[in-house]
Design a protein with these regions (language model features):
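Helical hinge/lid and interdomain linker segments adjacent to catalytic or ligand-binding clefts
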Residues: 24-140
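An acidic, glycine-rich "communication" segment
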Residues: 1-2, 9-19, 23, 36, ...
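Acidic/polar loop patches that form or flank catalytic/metal-binding clefts of enzymes
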Residues: 53, 157-158, 263-264
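Active-site-proximal beta-strand/loop segments in catalytic clefts of secreted hydrolases
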Residues: 7-10, 56, 80-82, 126-129, ...
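Extracellular ligand-binding/catalytic regions of CAZymes and related secreted enzymes
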Residues: 1-12, 18-19, 69, 122, ...
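Sec/Tat-exported extracytoplasmic proteins
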Residues: 78-81, 117-121, 150-154, 254, ...
Length: 264
């Protein structure tokens, strides 16, 4: 069984918040919600893949060597709504008790990620407000060396394209293994996506109908394969998508294609 490590698509919900007077209010509820359970379950549905799903704060808090071990022991790593700061910063940088006591540096997770993919680890880069360039540029992937392993090019401005009417996908490379047995015409509309540019040498497998922007693109970088899906595999953008009858098949196909490239 092949191993998948899925980072992102968790949230902490605080509330509801009640205000009894002008001076007193209280949050009366706290919940951890894994919006990634649809993708996790889809990938595990065929019995070919075992998925570990973690929130971004687990990734951010990893000790030196922990992330490297994950990359060494997994076939696919997924990033969804994981802004660049989670790669570039470390909690110890904000520990005031350490200021002025020793040199604070850690392995560069961006470089580690790029080198891992080129060495044979396969990766999915999935959309959201904090993916690609993201809301107000918060995603920031294109401003880091992650751009070397993205099968699309990020915009330099906010890239969110949203509509209450939704956007439908259409196939471009209809014979690509990722689309085997799928009919994208039956895929429900998504409520948003990240606008990106096609990258030379990286096939666009599907695009957003009437928009022309890539929906799915793939690439080979060294020994590893990369996939970009520019909408969200989870709500809210994907609140209709997750109930698509072929949702699990799409992601199973994607994982099979990633791991069939001669890498890990």
């Amino acid at each position: 069984m092949k191993k998948v490590y899925y980072i992102g698509d968790w949230v902490v919900q605080i509330g509801p918040v009640y205000a009894e007077t002008s001076f007193n209010h209280a949050a009366k509820g706290l919940d951890f919600i894994n919006y990634g359970h649809w993708l996790r379950d889809a990938l595990q549905s065929t019995g070919e893949f075992a998925v570990t799903s973690v929130p971004t704060w687990d990734f951010y808090n990893m000790k030196p060597g922990e992330y490297e071990n994950i990359l060494a022991t997994h076939h696919i790593v997924i990033f969804s709504d994981v802004e660049a700061k989670n790669f570039q910063l470390h909690p110890q940088f904000f520990n005031r008790h350490l200021f002025g006591t020793k040199v604070l540096t850690f392995p560069d997770r961006v470089k580690v990620t790029v080198n891992a993919l080129k060495s044979g680890v396969n990766m999915m880069f999935l959309g959201g407000w904090l993916s690609f360039n993201g809301e107000l540029g918060k995603g920031g992937w294109g401003r880091t060396p992650l751009r070397e392993i993205l099968p699309v090019e990020c915009l330099e401005v906010e890239d969110l394209r949203e509509s209450t009417e939704g956007f439908c996908a259409e196939a471009v490379e209809k014979k690509h293994p990722m689309l085997k047995g799928l009919d994208l015409a039956t895929m429900p509309p998504v409520l948003g996506f990240n606008r990106v540019r096609p990258r030379e040498g990286c096939p666009v497998i599907a695009r957003w109908k009437n928009e022309g922007d890539p929906a799915i693109a793939v690439g080979q970088f060294g020994k590893g394969r990369a996939l970009a899906y520019t909408s969200d595999p989870a709500p809210h953008w994907g609140c209709n998508f997750v109930f698509w009858k072929q949702y699990a098949k799409l992601w199973s196909n994607a994982a099979r294609w990633l791991t069939a490239g001669g890498g890990r």
